[in-house]
């Protein structure tokens, strides 16, 4: 499903590479964890796979293939089709990733609105199911709340729901339990 071949990423404002020679393969249904010290390139590798790094600020070499489709040098329009539909991402800082002016429900539903022709009520029901799967209490009530009205752990769960709502092939998790309570982690 996912193949990374000799990935190198260097930011223009840094002396050394953020990622140096990463190669890995992930098959359907497989779970792989990247472990390393802070600054070792785990997040940059994940962001490269998701197509979320600013291309004008870094140089890439190598290949990233999702079901044989090249992602590293793909057009932004191709990446937009893949992001959310085939790749879901959960970041460690949900406060910086959620739109503070948009209620939680529409944010969880957003990938369905963009990538499917699903009717609004069906999108809403799918979002509620994803929120329940992420162990959000009272998903219906949380849909009408803004990000600032939720705790860090609740917001992290909402972000997990948004990442899984469209049932992506690949789920990238960058320290997804950082904001969760110890009992949930």
What residue spans do the PLM features occupy?
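Conserved ABC ATPase "signature" region
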Residues: 70, 122-141
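The feature captures the beta-strand-to-loop junction immediately N-terminal to the Walker
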Residues: 35-36
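A short, proline-enriched helix->beta-strand linker immediately N-terminal to the Walker B motif
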Residues: 165-169
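Conserved ABC ATPase signature
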Residues: 145-150, 154
């Amino acid at each position: 499903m996912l193949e990374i071949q000799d990935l190198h990423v260097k930011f223009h404002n840094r002396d050394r590479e953020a990622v140096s020679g990463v190669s890995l393969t992930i098959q359907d249904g497989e779970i792989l964890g990247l472990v390393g010290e802070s600054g070792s390139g785990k997040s940059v590798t994940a962001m490269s796979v998701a197509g979320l790094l600013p291309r004008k600020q870094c140089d890439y070499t190598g290949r990233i293939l999702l079901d044989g489709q090249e992602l590293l040098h793909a057009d932004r329009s191709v990446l937009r089709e893949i992001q959310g539909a085939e790749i879901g991402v959960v970041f460690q800082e949900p406060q910086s990733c959620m739109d503070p002016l948009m209620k939680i429900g529409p944010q969880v539903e957003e990938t369905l609105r963009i990538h499917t022709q699903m009717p609004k009520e069906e999108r809403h029901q799918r979002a509620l199911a994803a929120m329940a799967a992420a162990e959000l209490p009272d998903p219906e009530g949380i849909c009408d709340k803004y990000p600032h009205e939720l705790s860090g752990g609740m917001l992290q769960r909402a972000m997990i729901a948004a990442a899984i709502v469209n049932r992506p092939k690949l789920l990238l998790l960058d320290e997804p339990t950082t904001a969760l309570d110890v009992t949930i982690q």
